[in-house]
Amino acid sequence: MTCPRNVTPNSYAEPLAAPGGGERYSRSAGMYMQSGSDFNCGVMRGCGLAPSLSKRDEGSSPSLALNTYPSYLSQLDSWGDPKAAYRLEQPVGRPLSSCSYPPSVKEENVCCMYSAEKRAKSGPEAALYSHPLPESCLGEHEVPVPSYYRASPSYSALDKTPHCSGANDFEAPFEQRASLNPRAEHLESPQLGGKVSFPETPKSDSQTPSPNEIKTEQSLAGPKGSPSESEKERAKAADSSPDTSDNEAKEEIKAENTTGNWLTAKSGRKKRCPYTKHQTLELEKEFLFNMYLTRERRLEISKTINLTDRQVKIWFQNRRMKLKKMNRENRIRELTSNFNFT
């Protein structure tokens, strides 16, 4: 059998609900289902459950249990394959209440969540509803979306619909960046100031002359010797100065490291400062009398010529080594002069 095409589902339900249609069904659910089998189509799917079909003047019978419904469901499944059965036209969608969706659909209250391209993809889904929601409903539930929730890196405020965007939304990102720049400049200013300001103590140390320079200025007024004596004094000073200046150089290096040696261009070694003519003459005179000095005599000489005890001691050591070297060279020269190599 086939269903007539001009019959609507409501035409079957109306005679059943009429007061004169009571003879068509009884209280048992099985006999009621047989009345629907005459049409051989899934018309009863649009009707309510069996308990709602009882008479208005009678209360729902407690003997009617849920175990009577499987016979009704089995008959619905046995009516035929949905491909062969008659298919009614898709009814027009019912108007939905404002802001209500089925539980399987996720609500998106924030219109700024996606860009314009991604919002266009959700257009066909909205067409299924006959009465789509107005834009104002979405604008009421709009909340500010953080930057890390946005789907695209571009500013979503530029992609908003006219109902969701405003003049303040476009100015907000630029005002935030402008407010961050003064803070960065404020943080950079103390760093620049810290780089420029340095302690002035190294300059004062470099301006103060060393004690050796003071001694040389005082000793310049001493008597001048012959040119040969000045050459000898220079030679002696060249031998004695490296040894005398080692300890003082180490002490000054430690002092410079504590005062910030990296600011100056000085090297680690102290500048070579030879003895003056007056100092070398006094030391040579004492060396002729005695090659080895006692501690008391060494202190007296150091006070008279403005030298330290250590400097006098090292000068005498170097002078003895020089005399020893000269004696060895003279002895070798005498030995070689006796032999004539042909």
Swiss-Prot record:
The modification Phosphoserine is found at residue 189. There is a cross-link at residues 106, 195, 254 (Glycyl lysine isopeptide (Lys-Gly) (interchain with G-Cter in SUMO2)). Residues 1-11, 204-219 have a biased composition (Polar residues). GO terms for cellular component: chromatin; nuclear body; nucleoplasm; nucleus. Residues 1-29, 187-271 are annotated as: Disordered. GO terms for molecular function: DNA-binding transcription activator activity, RNA polymerase II-specific; DNA-binding transcription factor activity, RNA polymerase II-specific; RNA polymerase II cis-regulatory region sequence-specific DNA binding; RNA polymerase II transcription regulatory region sequence-specific DNA binding; sequence-specific double-stranded DNA binding. The modification Phosphothreonine is found at residue 8. PANTHER family: HOMEOBOX PROTEIN ABDOMINAL-B (PTHR45874), HOMEOBOX PROTEIN HOX-C10 (PTHR45874:SF2). It is found in: Nucleus. InterPro entries: HD, HD_metazoa, Homeobox_CS, Homeodomain-like_sf, HXA10/ABDB-like. The keyword Endoplasmic reticulum does not apply. It comes from the Eukaryota. GO terms for biological process: anterior/posterior pattern specification; embryonic limb morphogenesis; negative regulation of cold-induced thermogenesis; neuromuscular process; positive regulation of cell population proliferation; positive regulation of transcription by RNA polymerase II; proximal/distal pattern formation; regulation of transcription by RNA polymerase II. SMART domains: HOX. Keywords: Developmental protein, DNA-binding, Homeobox, Isopeptide bond, Nucleus, Phosphoprotein, Transcription, Transcription regulation, Ubl conjugation. This is Homeobox protein Hox-C10. The keyword Hydrolase does not apply. It holds the Pfam family Homeodomain.
